[in-house]
């Protein structure tokens, strides 16, 4: 893909799979024409580690936030603190935050509380919100619409991306109406992901992003291996040929 420079919009370079490997990962990413990476925070208590990785190379940016799996275990973080941390120039988004009713690792009321805090932080910082949603479409839509409604009243719009998107059409339509982007991972290349491919075809090209969510979800033809940012090329090529 020598004519195109790619961005891996969502990876986790602070995870153990990448310990001591970031320089080599960046080298392989460059060889695949991946020009930039966004490494995503899942615990505010580990934000310093995420930020240090981002500061190690100009090709890496980061986010700040609490994954819904961690909502119950992480110390309470209010909107002011998230906005404060987001002032660092390396921070380009709030999250990943959201709702996960598939694993339910945190109580649902706690997940919604933490998600609402991140939504407000994204509005106040004017940074995009990075949303994780699994088996929680209705509540995710309700929270996002509430945040978007506030933005319509006070001039601080809510922007963001639904990361590692998996169907339904309902969530895609609601997110697009609010003004969000849709980010597709290697899942879209999987044989059993026809429903996702059909939803992807409904998303305007200028609202689509690609990501790895590495070290997870390696795309075909790398499926079964530990994922890494260079593999975003395979997802991008697959989508280009499909769309």
What are these regions (language model features)?
Residues 1-243:
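Mid-domain alpha/beta scaffold segments of enzyme catalytic cores
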């Amino acid at each position: 893909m020598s004519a195109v420079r790619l961005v891996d919009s969502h990876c986790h370079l602070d995870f153990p799979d990448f310990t001591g490997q970031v320089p080599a990962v960046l080298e392989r990413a460059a060889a695949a024409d991946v020009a930039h990476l966004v490494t995503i925070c899942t615990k505010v208590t580990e934000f310093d580690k995420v930020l240090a990785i981002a500061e190690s190379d100009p090709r890496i940016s980061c986010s700040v936030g609490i994954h819904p799996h961690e909502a119950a275990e992480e110390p309470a973080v209010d909107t002011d603190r998230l906005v404060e941390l987001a002032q660092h120039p390396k921070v380009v988004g709030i999250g990943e935050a959201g709702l996960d009713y598939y694993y339910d690792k945190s109580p649902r009321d706690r997940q919604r509380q933490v998600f609402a805090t991140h939504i407000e932080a994204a509005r106040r910082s004017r940074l995009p919100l990075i949303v994780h949603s699994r088996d929680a479409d209705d509540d995710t839509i309700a929270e996002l619409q509430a945040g978007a409604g506030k933005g319509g009243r006070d001039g601080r719009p809510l922007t963001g991306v639904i990361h590692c998107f998996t169907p339904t059409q309902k969530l895609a339509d609601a997110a697009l109406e609010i003004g969000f982007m849709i980010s597709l991972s290697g899942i879209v290349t999987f044989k059993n992901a026809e429903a996702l491919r059909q939803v992807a075809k409904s998303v305007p090209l200028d609202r689509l992003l690609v990501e790895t969510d590495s070290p997870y979800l390696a795309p075909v033809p790398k499926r079964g291996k530990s994922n890494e940012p260079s593999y975003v090329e395979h997802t991008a090529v697959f989508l280009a040929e499909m769309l």
